[in-house]
Amino acid sequence: WLMKSEPDVWSIDQQKKAGNKGAPWDGVRNYQAAKNLRSMKKGDQCFFYHSNIGKEIVGIVEVTKEHYIDKTDQSGRFVAVTVKFLRELDKPISLEEIKKHKELSHLSLIKQSRLSVMPIDSKSWKILNKMGKI
């Protein structure tokens, strides 16, 4: 998985400070992104992507609680998951670097740039880990 957050709203540093308890990944109001949240399982790992400022993958988080009603959504239609910080990448991976890699050209990060929560296939996960020097 890959989850996007604007670093001035929620950054990897704030996620790290949340500790093992983790923090809710809430506020998602796109139906496709919400569907992706519903598909996440406890233990799934997700790349943490800083959007708008930086535009780069900066770390990895882990799902600690599967989807539940997002308390910030008064309609009760959208869900959240809880994630905890696992690690920062040794080398952040910029969107430009990802776009240059032919084997990653199919990613929703490139094809659906407005999507905030998206799946990452295992081959792409390995490539991105290598690019991030993990």
Show the residue positions of the predicted features.
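Short, acidic Gly/Pro/Ser/Thr-rich loop/turn segments
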Residues: 8-10, 90, 125-127
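Short, charged beta-turn/beta-strand-edge "cap" motif at the junction between a beta-strand
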Residues: 49-55
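Charged phosphate-binding loop/patch that engages nucleotide di/tri-phosphates or the phosphate backbone
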Residues: 117-134
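Aromatic- and Lys/Arg-enriched surface recognition patch
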Residues: 58-118
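Loop/turn positions that initiate beta-strands
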Residues: 43-44
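Hydrophobic beta-strand signal
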Residues: 47-48, 62
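Short, charged, solvent-exposed linker or helix-capping segments at domain edges/interfaces
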Residues: 14, 92-98, 129-131
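Compositionally biased, charged N-terminal/linker segments
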Residues: 1-40, 134
